[in-house]
């Protein structure tokens, strides 16, 4: 009976597979949004202000960061929880695949969230004259929360690797 339960629990990891497929679809939608932004800006480029162009570029950077986060979560999550990816040639295999444990994924996700929050904050600050002081204050507080959380997670991870647990 115990072996049956263990096999069922072990096999249940495949329930995460549709989640990773969903993230792949989300990545496709994000890619479409990226190109939509580029197509939107091309005809208006000569009439745009410098700050308007910077805002568009920040949006593209934001989409890129979120896309990178999605790829990292999809690949490492699949490899950690479902099955190892068997890429035949070393040239095609990403260097970090198969090397990230759950803690390193958490730290990379946290630092990616901080980077994404930084881009959002910068976009907000570039339009500061149109934004209320309360919105700016909340943006800064939320960003600081992300920074402190990421720093705390990194410290805890470092301490656990040194044996302070």
From Swiss-Prot:
GO CC field: plasma membrane
This protein's record includes keyword Transmembrane: yes
InterPro entries: UPF0114, UPF0114_bac
PANTHER family: UPF0114 PROTEIN YQHA (PTHR38596:SF1)
One Pfam family linked to the record: UPF0114
Subcellular location: Cell membrane
Membrane protein topology class: Multi-pass membrane protein
Organism of provenance: Buchnera aphidicola subsp. Baizongia pistaciae (strain Bp)
Official protein name in the record: UPF0114 protein in repA1-repA2 intergenic region
Family listed: Belongs to the UPF0114 family.
Cysteine disulfide partners in this protein: none
Top-rank lineage group of the source organism: Bacteria
Key words, A-Z: Cell membrane, Membrane, Plasmid, Transmembrane, Transmembrane helix
Transmembrane regions: 10-32, 53-75, 134-156
């Amino acid at each position: 009976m115990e072996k049956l339960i263990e096999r069922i629990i072990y096999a249940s990891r495949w329930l995460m597979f549709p989640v990773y497929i969903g993230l792949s679809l989300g990545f496709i939608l994000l890619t479409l949004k990226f190109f939509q932004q580029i197509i939107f800006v091309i005809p208006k480029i000569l009439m745009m202000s410098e700050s308007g162009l910077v805002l568009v570029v920040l949006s593209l950077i934001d989409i890129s960061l979120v896309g990178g986060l999605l790829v990292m979560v999809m690949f490492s999550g699949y490899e950690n929880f479902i099955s190892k990816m068997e890429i035949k040639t070393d040239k095609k295999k990403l260097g970090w695949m198969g090397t990230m444990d759950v803690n390193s994924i958490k730290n990379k996700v946290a630092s990616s969230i901080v980077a994404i929050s930084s881009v959002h904050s910068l976009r907000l600050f570039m339009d500061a004259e149109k934004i209320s002081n309360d919105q700016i204050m909340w943006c800064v507080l939320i960003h600081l929360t992300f920074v402190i959380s990421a720093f705390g997670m990194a410290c805890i991870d470092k301490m656990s690797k040194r044996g302070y647990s």
